[in-house]
C-alpha cells in the first residue's frame, strides 16, 4: 500500500516537472503587434533544405 502511494506521488511530481520544463509562455492576445517586426521571405534554397 505504501509503495502504491509513493508511486502515485512520484508519477505526479514527474508529470509536473515534465510539464514545467516544456511549458512555453503563450503570447498574450492583448499584446500589440510589433510594428518593426517584418516577416522575411524564405529563399528557395531555404525552402528546399526544409523540404528535404
UniProtKB/Swiss-Prot annotation:
Pro-peptide residues, renumbered to this chain, are 24-41
Tissues showing expression: Expressed by the venom gland.
Q: What is the lineage of its organism?
A: Eukaryota, Metazoa, Ecdysozoa, Arthropoda, Hexapoda
Instruction: List the source organism.
Output: Eumenes pomiformis
Any extra remark in the record?
A: Not found in venom, suggesting that it is a minor component. Negative results: has no activity against fungi (B.cinerea and C.albicans) and bacteria (E.coli and S.aureus). Has no hemolytic activity against human erythrocytes. Does not show cytolytic activity against insect cell lines. Does not induce feeding disorder in lepidopteran larvae after peptide injection in the vicinity of the head and thorax.
Q: What is this protein called?
A: Venom peptide 4a
Looking at the UniProt entry, the stretches that span the membrane are none
Which residues are the signal sequence here? Answer: 1-23
Q: Which residues carry this modification: Alanine amide?
A: 51
